[in-house]
Swiss-Prot record:
Localization: Cytoplasm
Protein name: DNA polymerase IV
Natural source organism: Actinobacillus pleuropneumoniae serotype 5b (strain L20)
Similarity field: Belongs to the DNA polymerase type-Y family.
Chain residues that bind Mg(2+): 11, 106
Gene responsible for this protein: dinB
Pfam families registered for this protein in UniProt: IMS, IMS_C, IMS_HHH_1
Top-level EC class as recorded in UniProt: transferase
């Protein structure tokens, strides 16, 4: 019998805002957001839990945030500091394992299957890591521990902030059976509503469904949905994996038929893409990102992707791609639009060097 894996998902608690409060204790207990401007331009990068009580969240327009929370304290982004602290956290991870998959500055998977520290207990390893982050860096982290990658990520959100949750091999089957499908990665509002219309609310419902029907109805994602609902997730923790691309997409509440509607959606997606690029990798000229792609998924769940090398990342270039790929609709409705960008080759190499 194969060895049961021990996977930990670590997620820092409102990372950027927490660092700012650590650096300036006068901010503690007050609603704080990182990013945006007092003039109301831009969007929030993140905010602390006091601000979230007012309904604030990352990527919210600053003007809207200030209306909801007039006393909101805005702090400028300090990416060099966040990166330095992130590297300190990564060094703590590597005291226990070299199999670390970095998802962003504040999130990572760890495979501790072969770790002998803490008598091999993944639960105690996660606790020690969180204790070290607090004692050495005065920041809090949440953790999820499970035999499967997707379950570890779900578990890290169960007792947030500053907590951890364990899904053991013994209780994994029961946990998955009752798990709401909206908790599955990539099941957004629209997909969840479609599932609900079919009477599918939990993984248990998927288990009692017809496999061919799930595959046909949800396409490639149907396979992932079926496998997760049956406790199948063979994805490895990809140590030292540099991110080669970044994508954003929007599954639409209702299908669209017209190019003008799609252009409006691309406008919003482009803003999100730039926001995420700046959040994860700091200030970098958009002209350095030359390999762009756009994806359309149609009402029949088939999809098409168009990729081009251009003179730089811009809204106009994505609109041009959209106009070209729209010719492939063949009178079909569109239910999803996605934008993606590949990092420059030297950027990928630099990430790899940092993580080696």
């Amino acid at each position: 019998m194969a060895t049961q894996r021990k996977i930990i998902h670590i997620d820092m608690d409102c990372f950027y805002a927490a660092i700012e409060m650590r650096e300036n204790p006068a901010l503690i207990g007050k609603p704080v957001a990182v990013g945006g401007s007092v003039e109301g331009r831009g969007v929030l990068t993140t905010c602390n839990y006091e601000a979230r009580k007012f309904g604030l969240h990352s990527a919210m327009p600053t003007a809207q945030a200030l209306k909801r929370c007039p006393n909101l304290i805005l702090v400028p982004v300090n990416m060099p500091l966040y990166k330095a602290v992130s590297e300190q956290i990564h060094q703590i991870f590597r005291r226990y394992t070299d199999i670390v998959e970095l998802l962003s500055l504040d999130e990572a998977y760890l495979d501790v299957t072969d770790c002998r520290q803490c008598s091999g207990s993944a639960t105690w390893i996660a606790q020690e890591i969180r204790d070290a982050i607090w004692n050495e860096l005065h920041l809090t982290a949440s953790a999820g521990i499970a035999p499967l990658k997707f379950l570890a990520k779900i578990a890290s959100d169960q007792n947030k902030p500053n907590g951890q949750f364990v899904i053991s091999p013994e209780n994994m089957t029961a946990f998955i059976y009752d798990l709401p499908l909206k908790k599955i990665p990539r099941v957004g509002k629209v997909t969840n509503e479609k599932l609900a219309q079919l009477g599918l609310h939990t993984c248990g419902d998927i288990q009692h469904s017809d496999k061919a029907f799930i595959y046909k109805t949800f396409g490639k994602f149907g396979q992932r949905l079926w496998e997760f609902s049956h406790a199948i997730d063979n994805r490895k923790i990809e140590a030292n994996r540099p991110r080669k691309s970044l994508a954003v997409e929007n599954t639409l509440p209702t299908d669209i038929w017209h190019l003008a509607e799609a252009e409006q959606i691309v406008d919003e997606l482009f803003k999100k893409l730039v926001f995420r690029l700046q959040r994860n990798w700091g200030e970098r000229s958009l002209q350095e990102f030359k390999k762009l792609a756009i994806k359309l998924k149609f009402g029949d769940f088939t999809q098409t992707t168009l990729e081009r090398t251009t003179d730089g990342l811009s809204r106009e270039r994505f609109i041009e791609l959209l106009q070209q790929v729209w010719q492939r609709t063949n009178r079909r409705s569109v239910r999803l639009i996605g934008l993606s960008v590949h990092y420059p080759t030297e950027k990928v190499k630099k990430q790899l060097n940092l993580w080696e």
